Amino acid sequence: MNSIQKTRGLRIVLAMLMAVSGGVLLAAHSSRLTVSASDPGGGDWPMWGGTPDRNMVSNMKGIPISWDVQKKTNVKWVTALGSQTYGNPVVAGGQVYVGTNNEAPRDPKVKGDKGILMAFRETDGEFLWQAVTDKLAAGRVNDWPYQGICSSPLVEGKILYYVTNRGEVVALDTEGFRDKENDGAVKDEKLNGERDADVIWKFDMMEEVG
């Protein structure tokens, strides 16, 4: 790849990062995902901050200001996530997406420390599929243990964009392999069951732009 291509690629990736990875700035430890019982009224929250304005303002009415997970007060459903969860969940097209680690494994074949992006059904919290990313060999130098996926996803139509713990910008089909189709240019996913992510394309920033 020549310098012009690298520069162009870097501009594209930087634009993506401005949209996708802002959630790292608002990191918080969590081991559960809680969804409000308030009717969303069709109002998606498809990116960090809700809209490109990043003003964190919802146009929904009657939003609860208190929750009790144990008593299920103003809580629609609760599901376990990994031991650390950074960034923010996003909601789009009837699904909830959130990055975490593999400390609450959904697939017994996936063992050890991984970066995990999970998809759930918005109405009842049913687990739908997950994207799995191996840790970088350098460990703490580039990929701190158990931090998992730190970026907040961005959803546009039927495509989800996020940044992995390996510094890759990835586009996924929001249906995963549940639609029994392998979409996009990537056809060699190691995990391609019904509950696995369908990768459309991937851009490795560490390899391509240094």
Please place each PLM-identified region on the residue numbering.
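Noncatalytic, solvent-exposed loop/strand surfaces
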Residues: 23-210
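N-terminal secretory signal peptides that target proteins for export/translocation
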Residues: 1-10
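Intrinsic structural disorder/low-complexity segments
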Residues: 8, 14, 28-29
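Intrinsically disordered, low-complexity segments
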Residues: 1, 19, 28-29
